[in-house]
Amino acid sequence: DHIIVGGETQHSSKLEVFSGGKGLNQSIALAKAGVPVYHAGIVGTDGDILLDACKEAGVNTKYIRRLPVKGGHTMIQVDKNAQNCIILYGGTNQMQTKEFVDEVLADFGEGDYLILQNEINMLDYIIDQAYEKKMKIVMNPSPFDDKLSTCDLSKVHLFLLNEIEGEQ
């Protein structure tokens, strides 16, 4: 009915489980539009739903690694007016390493597009390395947080902004 507030308990009318995350959703949308897409990231032991969604959409999963821990999760609460509230648990999304980033970016270069979102770690390093390789960097800075202050956002060619983050 409404977005829950602190100290409140509320019944839910339904529970739905989907694969997703901004990065995965963008990769799938581009692949369905006919663009060759390589998705990079780290999934946990619970990542089969994500890998299956990639394969079904034609997304190349060569750069997806699996770790023996829980992956990232998102809980989205939607009220009767379709407004939402989103809570993130980073999990494996926060486990990128410089070595992994370097391994992925080694196969890409000038003119290739890199699409990022602020639900992963190492953004400053990823942006710097991609910029040095003259890649085109597209970024959704959501969730807008202090981590972005470590990034040289002047190296980003295009921003994809959500309503709230656009106001910030």
Task: Report the location of each language-model feature.
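Glycine-rich phosphate/adenosyl-contacting loop at the front of the ribokinase-like
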Residues: D1-A40, I49
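Acidic surface patches and DE-rich sequence motifs
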Residues: I4, G44, D79
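Beta-strand->loop->alpha-helix junctions that form or flank phosphate-binding loops
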Residues: K14-E16, Y38-T45, G58-G72, N140-S142
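Hydrophobic alpha-helical segments
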Residues: V17-G20, L24, G71, I127, ...
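A structural motif shared across PLP-dependent enzymes of the aminotransferase-like
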Residues: S19-G20, T45, M95
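Short alpha-helical
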Residues: N25, T45-I49, K70, N121-M122, ...
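Ribokinase/PfkB-type carbohydrate-kinase core domain
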Residues: D52-R66, V78-Q168
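C-terminal catalytic lobe of FAD-dependent flavoproteins
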Residues: M75
